[in-house]
Amino acid sequence: MCSGVSPVEQVAAGDMDDTAARFCVQKHSWDGLRSIIHGSRKSSGLIVSKAPHDFQFVQKPDESGPHSHRLYYLGMPYGSRENSLLYSEIPKKVRKEALLLLSWKQMLDHFQATPHHGVYSREEELLRERKRLGVFGITSYDFHSESGLFLFQASNSLFHCRDGGKNGFMVSPMKPLEIKTQCSGPRMDPKICPADPAFFSFINNSDLWVANIETGEERRLTFCHQGSAGVLDNPKSAGVATFVIQEEFDRFTGCWWCPTASWEGSEGLKTLRILYEEVDESEVEVIHVPSPALEERKTDSYRYPRTGSKNPKIALKLAELQTDHQGKIVSSCEKELVQPFSSLFPKVEYIARAGWTRDGKYAWAMFLDRPQQRLQLVLLPPALFIPAVESEAQRQAAARAVPKNVQPFVIYEEVTNVWINVHDIFHPFPQAEGQQDFCFLRANECKTGFCHLYRVTVELKTKDYDWTEPLSPTEDEFKCPIKEEVALTSGEWEVLSRHGSKIWVNEQTKLVYFQGTKDTPLEHHLYVVSYESAGEIVRLTTLGFSHSCSMSQSFDMFVSHYSSVSTPPCVHVYKLSGPDDDPLHKQPRFWASMMEAANCPPDYVPPEIFHFHTRADVQLYGMIYKPHTLQPGRKHPTVLFVYGGPQVQLVNNSFKGIKYLRLNTLASLGYAVVVIDGRGSCQRGLHFEGALKNQMGQVEIEDQVEGLQYVAEKYGFIDLSRVAIHGWSYGGFLSLMGLIHKPQVFKVAIAGAPVTVWMAYDTGYTERYMDVPENNQQGYEAGSVALHVEKLPNEPNRLLILHGFLDENVHFFHTNFLVSQLIRAGKPYQLQIYPNERHSIRCRESGEHYEVTLLHFLQEHL
């Protein structure tokens, strides 16, 4: 049996006997600390993340030309402060002995993409928050490879340009063309119609529109917005992902073009379709967050569903438009499901993902129930949608016209008693004509507790339905029998599926390329396996680094953005070569470099990764930044930097000198810095992450304290009487938990933007991990730090709270409520507010102030 008090607590409870062994951090003035931060930021500018991303390979058809591909991407050219559209030419031949550094070529001529003074519309600013975007300029683009059309948002407008396609490839930068509009307000989420690139869709004032790039014609397809600017008057939207869907499910769109068109009537009219989500938030609570225009004493209003309260009502609909030979829109029609969405799918709370099969025969969607423990993958034939009409008689007539064998198909189901981590990995194969079988690739975490790839074949069995009669579907009403399910990967490791991870499927060679952690949970690698005869898994990237890869459409090349804790990011292009009769074993050959690793700042010392076993025999990983002024026998003040929540992994073999540069700054001043991924962090399987289920804040600190004990014993320079705990968001929440439950371990806590009462956080996140409040009252109370302030220490200068006043994610209410409770309990605290910041600190001056505040608080009070 373990004793009630850990060795960490025993040592930390009293002062160290030998004060001479203490290393004391040199105290600097406020201006002195500012100079230190300026210096670290200046040197970090040399390695700041200017790496290219969002790659598109296009093969060049000229067999006699010197280049095989043109590679498009977003990047920040040298000397620029904003992202732009760039390209590089990939040569057909390279000299083995020479390092070929590809030049980054500007696609756009003298183009400023950032709005004047960096002022974005409210919609763009909030989307940047949800996507955690810090860069300016062009941050995304849509591309139609056959026509060479690029479409992107910039300077509060939309622009397009062409390269490749029938017009050939440009040789010098071009002026992008602005797409004029009659709409007021920003045009969000622009998408090219894959079946006819003359058309594109966009969202304006919460409604779905289409426009013709060539003629300028615009057509509003939905009519949810009532014309008033107020949130209260406009609860409905079409084609827009709500706050919770963006923030908690990583879905940033609510509309999807059908990839094919159909021709109808004697005039040969072309029909184009868009699947979209319609949302009604009229029963969702409205909250008021201070507006950036504070001097006007305004507030911004948001629909924000708090845990246990009502979510939006949702439905999937179709927008159809018919065009003539000149590309003129002849008509448009709004269609709804033959029976109400809530009747057909009564248990569905969230539409997690949606799209179309490549042949356009089916729309598909991933449906999730409210507890997020059951996911259904559903096919919806377009014939299941009928025109939205006012009269019941017309609706009945339209329903009667739907063939009886047209129905939804539930082709796959995932069920767990933990929670489902939503992801994008789904590849449907084209369905053979006249066949009932439907085959697809899917990643599933629920089967084994680790995310793996499966090839699934189902039979699309139909029943006869009278769609004029109300249907009360049974639990398995539309469920299709599974004929075959083959595991392509297996083991205690993960196929990467979250946060935008992709697979690339070569249907000619029957190979699937994916990223995973097969070799170590600390590194991401690119692998390939046959999906026809599942067997050997081949790794294509080099061990000792963590990689993020993009494959070419012809599967002959890939780009890897890779780094390690000691090597800043590189971006290299590789060519797969080998015999065509054995494509699985084609070897990657280094072809060219797009970016070489920059030199680290002279004072940068990479962290050291370690692992240890807890008393419960769970292996955990951590990393330590050793103090740069290390002297034998001296004990150093220590900062435990923590996140500790789900969906995040801090400890891995990737470069930390950009995002976490401040941890190196702390080490340069004489602090030891420790980071530990405890139970609840990701990339270790569902049950490791699921340790938090219904008990957030109750298991994480034990792992952190055991990690501190381990590093203190292993390294010998940790001063256990001078430990600070610091984190942001979930890390801010755990910093408070540490000081509440382990005040004898943590001398000070610095908590940034903490959730302090789970009852005030959103449905999608809180209920996934904590259930609804009525089912888990004890968990909610135990996990809400504001309800336990009496356990916080009575000594001043042990607690610092930081929060952005405009935070629309973890609302400032959390800090407000905590401070009220602290005052009521007579507890000391310090509070730093950032009046113009949201959940993440964006402004350079605010970021500098936060870092100086952190250093000053630590040097004075640790």
Curated annotation (Swiss-Prot):
SUPFAM superfamilies: alpha/beta-Hydrolases (SSF53474), DPP6 N-terminal domain-like (SSF82171)
Tissues showing expression: Detected in kidney, skin, brain, thymus and liver (at protein level).
InterPro entries assigned to the protein according to its UniProt record, in alphabetical order: AB_hydrolase_fold, Dpp_8/9_N, Peptidase_S9_cat, Peptidase_S9B_N, Serine_Prot_S9B/DPPIV
Any single GO BP term: proteolysis
One GO cellular component term noted in the UniProt record for this chain: cytosol
Chief site of localization: cytoplasm
Catalysed conversion reaction: Release of an N-terminal dipeptide, Xaa-Yaa-|-Zaa-, from a polypeptide, preferentially when Yaa is Pro, provided Zaa is neither Pro nor hydroxyproline
Cellular compartments annotated: Cytoplasm, Cytosol
Residues binding Val-boroPro, per UniProt: S729
Gene3D superfamilies in alphabetical order: alpha/beta hydrolase (3.40.50.1820), Dipeptidylpeptidase IV, N-terminal domain (2.140.10.30)
Regulation affecting activity: Inhibited by the serine proteinase inhibitor 4-(2-aminoethyl)benzenesulphonyl fluoride (AEBSF), and by di-isopropylfluorophosphate. Inhibited by Val-boroPro (Talabostat, PT-100), a non-selective inhibitor, which triggers pyroptosis in monocytes and macrophages. Val-boroPro inhibits activity by binding to the active site, mimicking a substrate-bound state, thereby displacing the C-terminal fragment of NLRP1, leading to activation of the NLRP1 inflammasome.
EC number: 3.4.14.5
Pfam families in alphabetical order: Dpp_8_9_N, DPPIV_N, Peptidase_S9
GO MF annotation terms: aminopeptidase activity; dipeptidyl-peptidase activity; identical protein binding; serine-type peptidase activity
UniProt entry keywords in alphabetical sequence: Aminopeptidase, Cytoplasm, Hydrolase, Protease, Serine protease
Active site residues per record: S729 (charge relay system), D807 (charge relay system), H839 (charge relay system)
Family statement: Belongs to the peptidase S9B family. DPPIV subfamily.
Subunit comment: Homodimer. Forms a ternary complex with NLRP1, composed of a DPP9 homodimer, one full-length NLRP1 protein, and one cleaved C-terminus of NLRP1 (NACHT, LRR and PYD domains-containing protein 1, C-terminus). Forms a ternary complex with CARD8, composed of a DPP9 homodimer, one full-length NLRP1 protein, and one cleaved C-terminus of CARD8 (Caspase recruitment domain-containing protein 8, C-terminus). In the ternary complex, only one subunit of the DPP9 homodimer is bound to NLRP1 or CARD8.
Function: Dipeptidyl peptidase that cleaves off N-terminal dipeptides from proteins having a Pro or Ala residue at position 2. Acts as a key inhibitor of caspase-1-dependent monocyte and macrophage pyroptosis in resting cells by preventing activation of NLRP1 and CARD8. Sequesters the cleaved C-terminal part of NLRP1 and CARD8, which respectively constitute the active part of the NLRP1 and CARD8 inflammasomes, in a ternary complex, thereby preventing their oligomerization and activation.
Name of the molecule in the record: Dipeptidyl peptidase 9
